[in-house]
């Protein structure tokens, strides 16, 4: 079996023409550019706004966490200081330095006819103490026991002694 190829006898040096290039889709090109431009125009501000919002949220979170931490420590120290300051009683020596007097007769200067610690009335000749800062009056034995445990007035919770900087605790008022 043999194959024959027809030959016309001419030799041509020109290459056969290449197929034409495919036509570019010029109708969709402006729409694509416009679409990409609008996406960039919208997405960049949205991304920047979201980034700023996240940073602001984190900043507020850290600020309030730090503020809460400081307040909690401050309240804890204040509570501990107050508990130490008011719950610790006075020394017997300090209590003995408080003003005392013998009860003679009912008077408005004593504030009442009863000692609020023992809920008993004042009697003629009993020793009493008048607290210097608030002026409340109690039986001497009652208030002495109270002040050894707690350094404040049993009625108004005012401190019996005032702390002055650079000095030790000292009673206020005169000592009788």
From Swiss-Prot:
<comment type="similarity">
    <text>Belongs to the RING-type zinc finger family. ATL subfamily.</text>
</comment>
<dbReference type="InterPro" id="IPR013083">
    <property type="entry name" value="Znf_RING/FYVE/PHD"/>
</dbReference>
<keyword id="KW-1133">Transmembrane helix</keyword>
<keyword id="KW-0862">Zinc</keyword>
<keyword id="KW-0808">Transferase</keyword>
<keyword id="KW-0479">Metal-binding</keyword>
<keyword id="KW-0833">Ubl conjugation pathway</keyword>
<comment type="pathway">
    <text>Protein modification; protein ubiquitination.</text>
</comment>
<dbReference type="InterPro" id="IPR001841">
    <property type="entry name" value="Znf_RING"/>
</dbReference>
<keyword id="KW-0863">Zinc-finger</keyword>
<dbReference type="GO" id="GO:0071456">
    <property type="term" value="P:cellular response to hypoxia"/>
</dbReference>
<feature type="transmembrane region" description="Helical">
    <location>
        <begin position="37"/>
        <end position="57"/>
    </location>
</feature>
<dbReference type="GO" id="GO:0008270">
    <property type="term" value="F:zinc ion binding"/>
</dbReference>
<keyword id="KW-0472">Membrane</keyword>
<dbReference type="GO" id="GO:0016020">
    <property type="term" value="C:membrane"/>
</dbReference>
<feature type="region of interest" description="Disordered">
    <location>
        <begin position="1"/>
        <end position="26"/>
    </location>
</feature>
<dbReference type="GO" id="GO:0016567">
    <property type="term" value="P:protein ubiquitination"/>
</dbReference>
<protein>
    <recommendedName>
        <fullName>RING-H2 finger protein ATL14</fullName>
        <ecNumber>2.3.2.27</ecNumber>
    </recommendedName>
</protein>
<keyword id="KW-0812">Transmembrane</keyword>
<dbReference type="GO" id="GO:0016740">
    <property type="term" value="F:transferase activity"/>
</dbReference>
<dbReference type="Pfam" id="PF13639">
    <property type="entry name" value="zf-RING_2"/>
</dbReference>
<feature type="zinc finger region" description="RING-type; atypical">
    <location>
        <begin position="115"/>
        <end position="157"/>
    </location>
</feature>
